[in-house]
Amino acid sequence: MHKRLDIVGRFYAQYDEDSRVEATRQGQMEYRTTMEYIHRHAQPGARLLEVGAGTGRYSIALAREGYDVTALELLEHNLEQRRQKSAGLSGLRAQQGDALDLSRVEDGEFDMTLVLGPMYHLYDPIEVRTAIREAIRVTKPGGVMLFAFLSVYAIMGNNYLKGNARYGIQENFGPDFRVLHFPEQLFTGYDIAEFEALFEDFPVRQLTTAAADGILELASGRRDFDLPDEEFEGWVRYHLATCEKRELLGHSSHLLYICRKN
């Protein structure tokens, strides 16, 4: 716990996640896609729990839309920013909390549970299963859960084809190209089938796996990348029509595993 908290805390203390989501086409697409799937599965006024809510990009927007939102965040730095942004906003309760311990939350308390960040930073198989189990426990039977995760193949394409491809392979794969997960990784990526298999022993039914931002992180690295507003809106429509296609998932940096509790 302390090692994970130190690694993640140092990163988010100096990284402006809100700017990535709000000011980059990749972040905008990730946000639009995630909100699209939330709206598909959450009834108006539903009780939502966001675990690992960061500075509140989703939880504040959802509370403003009339949802009853509880937002849990591990890092006090992020929690304080969210308190400042949401001052006076009804329908939102922000608390410090860890995805591995939701003991303050009752069984089946929420219509929908959002886990949109913690799985990026969990490496130990026991902790991964604990986070999944806790999210399922606090969701009502028939309720929907969204788990965000990272594609290891997108990590390779986006971060290591810059003169350090050999290091990227050593960092993310074993000799047989099995995906590695270890505490020193700031972000851990998954093979998509590997992530989906994590849920096989839990009382849930998979609804879909969707690409949240598609190829936009890779594309935005091009010097000639340009996606004006009108072009972007067209790309959003294309993306939402194709983001569940299996052949396109691996290029997406961020993905959503969406399931329903039995």
Give the predicted meaning of each segment.
Residues 186-203, 209:
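Short alpha-helix
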Residues 208-262:
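A C-terminal cap/extension of S-adenosyl-L-methionine-dependent methyltransferases
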Residues 57-101:
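Class I SAM-dependent methyltransferase SAM/SAH-binding core
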Residues 129-141:
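A short glycine-rich, Lys/Arg-flanked "PGG" loop and its adjoining helix->strand segment in the class I
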Residues 103-113:
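A short acidic, Gly/Pro-enriched loop at the edge of an enzyme's catalytic core
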Residues 112-126:
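A short SAM/SAH-binding and catalytic strip from SAM-dependent methyltransferases
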